[in-house]
Amino acid sequence: MTNIRKTHPLMKIINDAFIDLPTPSNISSWWNFGSLLGLCLIMQILTGLFLAMHYTPDTTTAFSSITHICRDVNYGWIIRYLHANGASMFFICLYAHMGRGLYYGSYAFQETWNIGVILLFTVMATAFVGYVLPWGQMSFWGATVITNLLSAIPYIGNTLVEWIWGGFSVDKATLTRFFAFHFILPFIILALAIVHLLFLHETGSNNPTGIPSNMDKIPFHPYYTIKDILGALLLILTLLMLTLFAPDLLGDPDNYTPANPLSTPAHIKPEWYFLFAYAILRSIPNKLGGVLALLLSILILAFIPMLHTSKQRSMMFRPFSQFLFWVLVADLLTLTWIGGQPVEHPYVIVGQFASILYFLLILVLMPTASLIENKLMKW
């Protein structure tokens, strides 16, 4: 008799995706991040659900409701900090997952890659609206500054901003709709993640060499389920260490002050995972130019498959491209650091150089290095 997991309509889907899935035998730990992202998403949805049971999306009570969660709700403090630091872990996994895709040429699976770019935008939107909910100083001013960027759009800008605000400033209507967005978006992310997997399973996974591995596949279970469990344990350990020993390490102290429209914080800055984009935005002295650069800094990922000029898929055997890839990583870390610094002399010019280098690397230097490597292969 055939096993039920291979015949039952629902079990068959799970079986084909997580049990009998043919997987390359040589994929490294860099391929763990996909499952870790799934784990992060589930944890965020669950902790978020329990937080939503006690949170009130109203300007007068939002801040107090967070205090109430931390002080009066059973284990409310740990749920709140797991959710806040879970977002940081989510972005760490997300950036590692994208870095892996860039390094090993996974973007050659265009449908999977494009859904991934849409997923990135959706996760960033979710994190942004979520940061507004505690209604602290940085929540309020972050929302004001970022939504105000839309006013740079010619002709419709101001109308658009007021439409998003639901009034003439960030207020009660804004908070209520941001809570609604923050609740619905994770489920949209979940649906997109399933589509992402669907497209991936059409082609099968890439591997470190970038060479087709159809002649050397192994079942996902038990080999990669065990490997993924190890990654999951490390992720949970890191998250618990962060949550229990340094819950506010990645947060902003300004957000412990209730929102006050009459007092602007000295340095308005987003959470650490947006600082690189914020630095690119600030490096251009023109409002519209800055907004376009900000948008392009993420949207450029969609053009990566078109910028691939190498005859090899992976960077595994391409030393020049490898060097430029790590320069790009260093550049992004520099931008992240600059984004958290005040707008004054040494930081401004360093941020401008780093921003130029970011676009130069992706649009010019890396495609050129690939062409040089193609020539060297003929020697």
Swiss-Prot record:
Domain of life: Eukaryota
Compartment annotation: Mitochondrion inner membrane
CDD domains: cytochrome_b_C, Cytochrome_b_N
Protein name per its UniProtKB record: Cytochrome b
Protein family: Belongs to the cytochrome b family.
Gene Ontology annotations of biological process type: mitochondrial electron transport, ubiquinol to cytochrome c
Note: Heme 1 (or BL or b562) is low-potential and absorbs at about 562 nm, and heme 2 (or BH or b566) is high-potential and absorbs at about 566 nm.
Transmembrane segments: 33-53, 77-98, 113-133, 178-198, 226-246, 288-308, 320-340, 347-367
Any one of the GO CC terms: mitochondrial inner membrane
Gene Ontology MF terms: metal ion binding; ubiquinol-cytochrome-c reductase activity
Cofactor(s) listed: heme b
Keywords for the protein's UniProt record, in alphabetical order: Electron transport, Heme, Iron, Membrane, Metal-binding, Mitochondrion, Mitochondrion inner membrane, Respiratory chain, Transmembrane, Transmembrane helix, Transport, Ubiquinone
Oligomeric and partner information: The cytochrome bc1 complex contains 11 subunits: 3 respiratory subunits (MT-CYB, CYC1 and UQCRFS1), 2 core proteins (UQCRC1 and UQCRC2) and 6 low-molecular weight proteins (UQCRH/QCR6, UQCRB/QCR7, UQCRQ/QCR8, UQCR10/QCR9, UQCR11/QCR10 and a cleavage product of UQCRFS1). This cytochrome bc1 complex then forms a dimer.
Role according to the record: Component of the ubiquinol-cytochrome c reductase complex (complex III or cytochrome b-c1 complex) that is part of the mitochondrial respiratory chain. The b-c1 complex mediates electron transfer from ubiquinol to cytochrome c. Contributes to the generation of a proton gradient across the mitochondrial membrane that is then used for ATP synthesis.
Cofactor note: Binds 2 heme b groups non-covalently.
Topology term for the membrane: Multi-pass membrane protein
Binding annotation for a ubiquinone: H201
Organism of this sequence: Eubalaena japonica
Residue positions binding heme b b566: H97, H196
Binding locations of heme b b562: H83, H182
